[in-house]
């Protein structure tokens, strides 16, 4: 599957659907971004069931700002509408494949429970 250009207009709809979305925040002038692009594109071909989206931080400054992107490339993984990974830096192919494997293995019911407990603890501590 080819990568999809993500914009302010389609980001929420495409990345908050069921399934896994890998999102690469990048810019044309960024050397590490250009080095990571073939790794990301090849992974999209190997995993057609996953959305591989790219956000051009130069063209989509509001989107990059909304996600607090301060370093590129930054890779995010969203599973079933929940952000489960966010890290700046380019990954080598083996590390990207391991990340995809780990995202597939997540028990999303458990992730949601943990998030709910964290929010409750934070709310309880703040009171």
Stretches with model-predicted labels:
Residues 122-127:
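Conserved small/polar residues in nucleotide/adenosyl-binding loops
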